[in-house]
Amino acid sequence: MNMIEKEVAVKDLVTKSNLPASDYVINPYVGCPHGCRYCYACFMKRFTNHSEAWGSFIDIKRCDTPISKRKLQGKSVFLSSVTDCYNPFEEKYRNTRKILEQLISINCELNISTKSHLILRDIDLLKQCNNLKVSVSVNTLDEQFKNDMDHASSIMKRLETLETLHQNGIYTVLFMSPVFPGITDYKEIIVKTQRYVDEYWFENLNLRGSYKQDILGYIKSACPQLVELYDEIYVKGNMRFWNNLAVEIEEYCAAHSIKHINYFYHKELVEAKLRTK
C-alpha cells in the first residue's frame, strides 16, 4: 500500500498524558504504516480529519518551538502513544532523533516504545539518556502470526534489538502486548529472552470499534479451536480468563524473580488517573 505522507505544522510536540505511567507524551507523527490489525490508535482519525484508512497515511509533525526543559524537568515522558516513533518514515524525516537530541539534556524519566529495529540507529543518543527504558513489543515467537497481524520488524529483529540495547547498557523492557488468549505463550517468550530483558510488561487484547470483527474473523478462520474462548471473552464479556491469567503471571514472575508490570486493567488505570486530576 502506498502511504499518503504530509508535513504538518504544530505548535508543540509535547502533550499531557492520560496514560497511567507517564506525565507527558510525544508523538512525532500522526498515523503509522505498521498496519497492526488490533491498533487502538485508529480513533485518532476523529481528531485529525483524515478520511483515509488508518495505516494508509502519515503526517510528519514540524515544530519550530524547542521542547520546554522546565515543563519536562523531573517528569515522565513517553515516546509514543499513538504512533511508532521509529516507524519506517523516521529513517527519512528523523523527527524522533531530533527530539532525542533535545531530551538528553533534560532530567526526565524517558520511556520509548517501538516495534522497530530502527531504534538502534540512535544508540549513541540513547546511551546519553540518564533515566531511560526502551520497550519493544513482542507477543509471539511465531513469525507467521506476527505477519498476519502487522507489517513491523520481524520477531527475530525485535529480539536482536532488545539484546543489542541490553549489551549497550540500556534498560530493556519486553512489552507483551497485546496478549492474545490461547496464542501468546508468555512463558515461552520469557524463557527465550530473560537473558537480555530487564523487565516485562503485559497488556491484554482489547477488542472494540472497527477492528473487533476483523480479529474475531481471523480467529474463526485461522484458529477455529479458539472461537469458543474468544466468544466467551469478547462477545459475552466474561473476564474470568484475564483474572486467572493475571494471577498465573504474577505467581510465575514471583517464583522466577522477574520484574514486571501488569497492564491488563489499563482502562481502569487510566480512569483512576483521570479522577486524581
Task: Annotate each PLM feature.
Residues 1-133, 141-144, 155-156, 167:
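Conserved Radical SAM active-site core
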Residues 2-9, 15-16, 187-277:
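Auxiliary Fe-S-binding modules of radical SAM enzymes
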Residues 76-78, 109-111, 131-135, 171-175, ...:
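Structural preference for beta-strand elements that scaffold enzyme active sites
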Residues 82-84, 115-117, 137-141, 177-179, ...:
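Active-site beta-loop-alpha junctions enriched in small/polar residues
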Residues 85-87, 143-151, 171-177, 236:
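Surface-exposed cleft-lining segments at the edges of enzyme active sites
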Residues 104, 166-167, 194, 254:
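Anion (oxyanion) recognition and catalysis
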Residues 164-184, 236-239:
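Conserved strand-turn element in the central/C-terminal portion of the radical SAM core barrel
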